[in-house]
Amino acid sequence: MIIAVIGDSSCSSEEARLAETVGELLAQRGATVICGGLGGVMEAVCRGAKSTGGLTVGILPGQDVSTANPWVDIPLVTGMGEARNVVVAKSAQAVIAIGGGYGTLSEIAYALKNGIPVIGLNTWSLSRNGREDDPIIRVQSAAEAVNKAISLAKRHKVRKNDSPFSPSPSSSPIKGEEIGCALAKRRKKL
């Protein structure tokens, strides 16, 4: 199971504490953490996941692997800048948003547009025309965020071609479960 954790690269100490706890709890539940791979919330969640033996994937905006925070196991360079937010959001079965700026807002939008559940801890509020129909699932603690994300991720169906990459007609699409299995095998080797 792959859970994205998103948030600002320059976060408050409270957001960093929440992210680190989320990372610890996700790793304890066997989830792979995917994030933008840089600092702030991304670094804190990776640090938390690594502290309990978890696997972390960082989708980096540039082409320099050395920009990844030290707790990223699998740094993936994209050269896409902020467009890599699509990859972060669509690679997950659920997304946990902690705080965040406009980059986080874009990841929330990509996830929601693609039917991926978003759980929010002190993050953006989205409603249309002042209505109370915020599609972000609000929680009050790291434990509640992880429990909700795991529960929803188990129900989230990975559809054929549900990938930010378009496979060629002659290739078979890689499903989220297959990526999770491959990452789990790699984790056992580490």
What are these regions (language model features)?
Residues G7-S10, E82-A145:
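C-terminal binding/interaction regions
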Residues K160-N161, K188-K189:
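Polybasic, lysine-rich low-complexity intrinsically disordered segments
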Residues A149-K157:
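Short, hydrophobic alpha-helical segments
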Residues G176-E177:
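Glycine-biased, low-complexity coil/linker segments
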Residues M1-V57:
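Glycine-rich beta-alpha loop segments
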Residues I59-V95:
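Glycine-rich oxoanion-binding loops at beta->alpha junctions
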